[in-house]
Amino acid sequence: MKKFFYLSAILAIVLVSCNSEEEYIAKLSNTASMIEKEADLSEAITLHYCDTWRKVIYDHEYNGEYCTDFNEALAKHQEFIITTDTYKRLKQKRDSIEAIMPQLNDYPSSCKDAYNELVSIYADTDELFRFADEPRGSLSTYSTKT
């Protein structure tokens, strides 16, 4: 998560240098803010998955009931997650970002660095979103990558 804050700070600095193209900068800045919110929501969901995963593996419990099959528990938890407001907001942010990103491809030359930085942030957030959308791997790799 710290990476997103550092990258956002770099993006802000680069954006200041691109002030000749105000409309593009506003759209780029808005998109960066949306990506940051998407990352926050994704992180909240992945942390919830990690907690559930650990509890099933170490305590053999899911939702207050005895459970030894963590795959079954994760599937049930995923069914629960997709009904939450957090997940619904995440999907809305995701859809909005995916609609806006292609519009940013045609950037002014003075905003090339800002655009490239945004694409880098977006790629990292995309991976985090995929982990929030569908947990995969082992608990160890999942918690390390998220």
Predicted stretch roles:
Residues 18-82:
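Immediate post-signal-peptide N-terminus of mature secreted/exported proteins
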